[in-house]
């Protein structure tokens, strides 16, 4: 009987080890950005911001750490290695002169997780990378649209007691809650229908004016989870550049996320920091 118990314990431990292939620690900044410590080409120690909306890596013109061993040609560098902890990733592409978030020298994308399940675990400040389907108990499945290396999910916006569905790009580099496209903002009259708590005016070199508005969305529903009083930004004015809706870092951090290897599904569970209403 004792031998059977030992064997069962060993098999359970082995199963856990096989499923959780590796963990990557990160630090969450006060701006809600994820920072990963890396060693590039075995020489350059860089703090890179995780950007879920890209696959490759980049360095910023405002970086504070040296990148002497990343060789660029026409602002592109191929064949680099990136070491995180004890794991080294090879053949990584870097772009030069791309701006990044606070406290970082550049960005790191999802390419290091290619063809694998991966989890953004905000509760424990780590990524978990799996070599097979992990335990998804207590997670809710959501359809995922994956295009050009970017992740999109559908969600509902409650505006003036009306439910408006839209697709959102997951954008961990933008520190706010939501950012709406110009089209969505115009179609649903956000300037009139949201409570506005802030405004910033910008004038470009041609004299055209752009206003950045900060509003409050009463309810935002993703899957069966409802967030209340979510900060939501949008633009008004003569400049029309915002083509996509964003679910940004302040909303992303309220959940733990597991992405499947095929990038067709994402599984979410509320994080410990989240105060929300769950629809039964």
Residue ranges and their predicted role:
Residues 20-280:
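Pepsin/retropepsin-fold aspartyl endopeptidases
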Residues 1-25:
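Bacterial Sec-dependent N-terminal signal peptides
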């Amino acid at each position: 009987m004792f031998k059977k118990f030992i064997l069962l314990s060993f098999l359970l431990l082995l199963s856990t080890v096989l499923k959780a292939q590796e963990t990557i620690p990160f630090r969450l900044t006060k701006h809600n950005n994820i920072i990963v410590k890396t060693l590039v080409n075995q020489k350059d120690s860089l703090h890179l911001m995780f950007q879920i909306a890209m696959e490759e890596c980049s360095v910023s013109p405002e970086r504070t750490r040296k990148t002497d061993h990343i060789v660029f040609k026409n602002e592109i560098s191929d064949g680099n290695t990136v070491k995180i902890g004890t794991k080294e990733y090879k053949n990584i592409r870097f772009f030069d002169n791309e701006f990044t978030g606070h406290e970082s020298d550049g960005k790191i994308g999802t390419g290091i997780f290619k063809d694998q399940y991966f989890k953004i675990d905000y509760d424990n400040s780590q990524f978990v990378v799996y070599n097979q389907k992990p335990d998804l108990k207590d997670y809710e499945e959501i359809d995922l649209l994956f295009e050009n290396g970017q992740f999109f999910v559908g969600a509902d916006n409650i505006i003036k007691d009306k439910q408006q569905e839209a697709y959102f790009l997951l954008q961990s580099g933008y520190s706010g809650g939501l950012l709406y496209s110009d089209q969505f903002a115009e179609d649903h009259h956000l300037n009139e229908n949201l409570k506005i708590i802030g405004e910033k005016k910008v004038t470009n070199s041609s004299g055209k004016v752009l206003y950045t508005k900060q509003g409050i969305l009463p309810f935002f529903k993703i899957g069966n989870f409802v967030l209340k009083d979510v900060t939501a930004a949008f633009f008004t004015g003569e400049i029309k550049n915002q083509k996509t809706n964003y679910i940004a870092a302040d909303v992303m951090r309220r959940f733990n996320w597991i992405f499947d290897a095929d990038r067709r599904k994402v599984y979410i569970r509320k994080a410990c920091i989240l105060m929300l209403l769950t629809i039964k």
